[in-house]
């Protein structure tokens, strides 16, 4: 379970900065130090933390706070999703956003920020069913 929790923590950080950096073309420092963007980063991280519960992984609000503060301390770097976008490579939207959205839906929890990032990056609305976006083991 500790490994699963660490994987979820990594996804929380990735979901917080990767998609928004691709939408805004901003590096991590800008995302976490501009209030409106920082609020979206933090909100996406909270949504991802809630999604972890579907897999039986408990992420506390204090842990999300710690991860957000860690990201704020990063040097200004381009995220992997921004680099992929700039190089014309396919973005890992299903793995990063789709899995969070699907789990939040199954739990009846909101994922508005994550859903809006999906829509912005795909230029299409979310399907009614997200079956197949993740496999539960």
Predicted segment positions?
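Conserved anion/nucleotide-ligand pocket segment
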Residues: 1
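NAD(P)-dependent Rossmann-like dehydrogenase/reductase catalytic/cofactor-binding core
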Residues: 39-137
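Active-site-proximal catalytic alpha-helix in oxidoreductases
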Residues: 4-32, 36-49, 76
